[in-house]
From Swiss-Prot:
GO terms for molecular function: DNA binding; serine-type endopeptidase activity. Keywords: Autocatalytic cleavage, DNA damage, DNA repair, DNA replication, DNA-binding, Hydrolase, Repressor, SOS response, Transcription, Transcription regulation. Disulfide bonds: none annotated. Homodimer. It comes from the Bacteria. It is an enzyme of class 3 (hydrolase). The active site is at 131 (for autocatalytic cleavage activity), 168 (for autocatalytic cleavage activity). The keyword Transcription applies. It catalyses: Hydrolysis of Ala-|-Gly bond in repressor LexA. This is LexA repressor.
Length: 211
């Protein structure tokens, strides 16, 4: 099965969602999870997965995705390498500054040791900006993201506001959600009631490529 790293990650998401919730994600949920600007990109990858024989789609059903053969849930372990080694896709950029438009879909990947991360990440994002330097997160770093919708106040998260994504410190107080930078040169971002807001995942560590 000749799949790109993005397609393998989508296949993994489908398998995990079926395992945990009993149903596959919708095309909209896939688009959001991977930072696509619309469902057409998700449709493109689903068509490729179907052509490769990895999934079967049922016309007319919102969640009409069926696995032909489920990928192993420990897919991130690189075949032929020790269990502590991960092979993670680099799925684009994330803003450490003002939020930027989603730019996720690269098929690059990195092989690395699990010891750098807790919990184990599902993918990497390249940081753009310096708003998180007081947390040791610098422009050009690769941050690990553990995919989850749940986060607590005080955790560093990758968040989506409308069609933009950013990495910030999450602060929740009553009905107020703020995303705080860790650089005094930047102002907090207050999430407005009419904005489409979601948690894409938790920050769980970083790599600093030589530069």
């Amino acid at each position: 099965m000749d799949l790109t790293d993005t397609q393998q990650a989508i296949l993994q998401l489908i398998a995990e969602r079926i395992e945990s919730e009993g149903a596959p994600p919708s095309q909209t949920e896939i688009a959001r999870a991977f930072g696509f600007k619309g469902v057409r990109a998700a449709q493109y990858h689903l068509e490729a997965l179907e052509q490769a024989g990895a999934i079967r789609r049922i016309p007319g059903q919102a969640r009409g995705i069926r696995l032909v053969q489920a990928p192993p849930l420990e897919k991130l372990a690189e075949p032929g390498l020790p269990d502590n080694v991960l092979r993670l896709p680099v799925l684009g950029r994330v803003a450490a500054g003002l939020p930027i438009g989603a730019d996720i879909g690269s098929d690059d990947f990195v092989v690395l040791d699990r010891v750098f991360f807790s919990p184990a990440p599902d993918y990497l994002l390249k940081v753009q900006g310096d708003s998180m330097i007081d947390e040791g997160i610098f422009d050009g770093d690769l941050i690990g993201v553990h995919r989850t919708r749940d986060a607590h106040s005080g955790q560093i998260v990758v968040a989506r506001i409308d069609d933009e994504i950013t990495v910030k410190l999450l602060k929740i107080a009553k009905d107020r959600i703020r995303l705080l930078p860790r650089n005094p040169d930047y102002k907090p971002i207050e999430v407005l009631p009419d904005q489409d807001f979601s948690i894409e995942g938790l920050y769980c560590g970083l790599l600093r490529p030589n530069r």
